[in-house]
């Protein structure tokens, strides 16, 4: 198996980032399933959906460690991970599965914001509704995997060298190199989902954020100051999560599109595209653990067992405002778990 010094650095990076992502998301799933208050059930569906998706992404990244050469409507992937021993088709399938996990993770963050917007209007949100939203949204990334069943790929050295404009040295020494073109609808659809789809997703997220803040600022709104403050903090947490792709997914998509449409004609970004994309699954679970109070409290108690249990300074069960209405009290309990 041939690897140069840059490949070795990239493999080391992939091993560290993927391993941390698997550990963080695995631990977050433990917290979701065993340390979540029952009143958070609808929201934990979205948390679990995001975490499971990101865990799957990290596993696929570790298996493939793809070096993506994107240039002039051609894509050539050099697989440096274990999947190279599984053959060309399986390597490309796992790679596409990895991309579909990335898209579903982004969609799941959007659904969390949509959930908050809807729940503020209705004051009730069934768990079945959360599952239905996740399943319906998953149809988009699932179509990415289904669409490549009949894709035409090549492992021919001469063709792949032409695809990369003969700019890659030692291409013939790699065990598994897969090339394809954007002329195929399946490849075009996958590329659009990873790049262009980000625009409507972000539009929905920030429209929901705008609507939530407008509702909370409306005079005479039914929630008291405490609940309003907690909801704003939850919105802040979701906003922070939605900003992570700005520094990971968006630059990766921009580089990919720039190389595809002749803005940049170089193979030097082969390591960067997936490297940027792979930061989100590692950072996002840490953001979730920090902002969800029961999870953060569990970490604090685990590390400093002598500390007293954290008590929210904003809301007490003895506060009569807590019992303003049954629907309102449930929503208040949900929001007090976000700080």
UniProtKB/Swiss-Prot annotation:
Question: What's the protein's topology in the membrane?
Answer: Multi-pass membrane protein
- Signal peptide extent: none
Alphabetical keyword list: Membrane, Transmembrane, Transmembrane helix
- TM segments? 14-34, 45-65, 94-114, 128-148, 188-208, 237-257, 269-289
Query: Could you tell me where this protein is found in the cell?
Result: Membrane
The organism encoding this protein is Caenorhabditis elegans
Similarity comment = Belongs to the nematode receptor-like protein srd family.
Which lineage ranks, top first, belong to the organism behind this chain?
A: Eukaryota, Metazoa, Ecdysozoa, Nematoda, Chromadorea
Major localization listed first in the record, in broad terms: membrane
Recorded GO cellular component terms are: membrane
Judging by the UniProt lineage, the source's domain of life is Eukaryota
The name of this protein is Serpentine receptor class delta-32
InterPro entries, alphabetized: 7TM_GPCR_serpentine_rcpt_Srd (IPR019421), Nematode_rcpt-like_delta (IPR050920)
